[in-house]
Amino acid sequence: MKDGFLKAAAAAPKIRVADPAWNALEICKALDSCYAQRAKLIVLPELCLTGYTCQDLFLQERLLEESLEGLQTVLEHTKGHDALTFVGLPFEKDGKLYNVAAAVQDGRILGLVPKQNIPNYGEFYDCLLYTSPSP
């Protein structure tokens, strides 16, 4: 931090739909670029570990498991770095599916932030898949 400011970065890695392992490697490449520029806050796209357009594939346990494995790859990559990073992925808890941003830093998950406003208009059918967290 310099003069009360920190360097923030928005990274947009290449993404393959329903390929969390490949996406995790691309995310790690993007993080390296952010680390090289000394970013202390890094945000990645919504559902970047799976791609946004998986539709019914989000209901497959295999994709959810692979996205957690991809998150583990990213976690390992963040070890030794103090940048607070937000990584998007689907997350299932108690039979409910959430669209979350995982807050990670130095190899640790600090928390999961579920998407609050689930759209239900136009081309968005997120409400058919995701649960909005209770207030």
Whereabouts are the PLM-identified features?
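Cys-nucleophile CN-hydrolase/nitrilase-fold catalytic domain and related Cys-dependent amidase chemistry
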Residues: S33-Y121, Y125-L128
